[in-house]
Regions:
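Short acidic, flexible loop segments centered on an aromatic residue
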Residues: 131-148
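Acidic-aromatic/histidine active-site loop/patch
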Residues: 36-123, 130-133, 295-297
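Beta-strand-rich extracellular modules
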Residues: 4-6, 132, 191-193
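Asparagine-centered strand-capping/turn motif at beta-strand->loop junctions
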Residues: 129-133, 350, 356
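Extended terminal and domain-junction accessory segments
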Residues: 10-58, 160-355
């Protein structure tokens, strides 16, 4: 779960839940275009427990949690130092050095840890890609196979083809993939986005009738546990450079809903002609709160302090009282408008977790 209200916790039981509306006509029409569906569940896995990471993030001075030690796809992955440095090593991202640990005796048997999805040749599958990462945004791609994006965060969109796809924490996409290449086993990987390092995630797509074993490129790839600071991965297929924003902008510029009936209230945005030519710039930054010494996220130099009740509860009560106008006609108590130009002074508001 990606949290927008407080610190999230990534310990314990995790997994996907897909809730479908059997009466949704868009979903019914989409279902005619694919043979079956599979889940791609993405996770960055920290080897420290959540309490330890939480304590560091909430301390003064701030202690950064660093990069995850492993990346999992559908719960499987490899902590590559087991393969390259021996049975008594672990990567310490804060130093960085190798430190003693015990690795599983069968760690070198790649098939034991990397998951495999078996597909029928010539069939089209819907892949529900779920970004369950705690921190790291990634780019997902399948060796020698393009993807067609058909759904984003539960909304059916106009289809468009991509070679790879950015998945940030909390995001969900559905893509259609036709497995019409030469029968074999193909590697899919993740590449880090907007961070200079991250372990790589792996999953295999195996055509029915393919031989045993894994692609030789995978044997080489697991010997490179972290993508270097230059941001290039040795994985096949290639991913964008970690700090290249163009692929993300291009992706989001193509996202258009198939059914505008889902947004009946959008017209209020265009009631004022000025709204069509207004440019709003929101800059996110981290600042130190003088009273506590803690780091805080801010938007245009304005940050927020959480109240006792969730903001959604306060907002609901405000707009459902007698005589209240629909938002934004009714002001939400404890909130303020982010200024269009950042104030020179850092402002701490008493709003409830979100600035409107």
């Amino acid at each position: 779960m990606n949290s927008d209200y407080s610190l999230e916790r990534a310990d314990g039981f995790q997994g996907p839940i897909v809730i479908s509306d059997p009466d949704n006509e868009d979903e019914k029409q989409l279902a005619a275009f694919y043979y079956a569906e599979e889940i791609i569940f993405l996770q960055d896995w920290y080897h420290q427990d959540g309490d330890t990471r939480h304590a560091g993030l909430d301390s003064v001075p701030f202690i950064w949690i660093g990069y995850a030690q492993s990346f999992l796809i559908n719960g499987g992955g490899i902590f590559a130092p087991c393969l390259t440095v021996g049975e008594d090593s672990i990567y310490d991202s804060t130093n960085p050095v190798w430190k003693p640990m015990a690795c599983a005796a069968d760690c070198s048997v790649i098939e034991n840890y990397i998951k495999t999805i078996t597909v029928e040749p010539g069939k089209t599958y819907r892949l529900r890609i779920i970004g369950a990462q705690e921190l790291i945004g990634v780019n997902f791609a399948i060796q020698n196979h393009n993807m067609t994006v058909v759904e984003a965060d539960g909304t059916i969109v106009e289809p468009f083809a991509v070679e790879n796809l950015d998945i940030m924490p909390g995001q969900r996409y559905s893509v259609l993939v036709t497995f019409d290449k030469e029968v074999g086993t193909y590697l899919a990987t993740t590449g880090v986005r907007y961070r200079s390092q991250s372990p790589t995630g792996y999953i295999l797509f195996k055509y029915q009738g393919a031989g045993e074993g894994v692609p030789s490129i995978l044997e080489d790839e697991v010997n490179n546990p972290f993508q270097g600071t230059a941001g290039f991965s040795t994985a096949v297929p290639p991913h964008p450079v970690w700090n290249d924003t163009e692929p993300t902008i291009a992706l989001e510029s193509k996202l258009f809903t198939m059914n505008t009936d889902y947004f009946p209230d959008y017209s209020y945005i265009t009631q004022n002609d000025d709204s069509l030519v207004r440019r709003i710039v929101i800059a996110g930054n981290q600042l130190t709160q003088n009273s506590t010494g803690k780091l805080r996220w801010a938007a245009n130099n304005v940050t927020s302090m959480m109240g006792a009740a969730p903001m959604i509860t306060i907002a609901y009560d405000a707009v459902t009282t007698d005589g209240a106008l629909p938002w934004p006609g009714t002001k939400i108590p404890g909130t303020l408008i982010v200024p269009d130009k950042p104030p020179s002074k850092f402002i701490v508001s008493d709003c409830l977790g979100r600035i409107l």
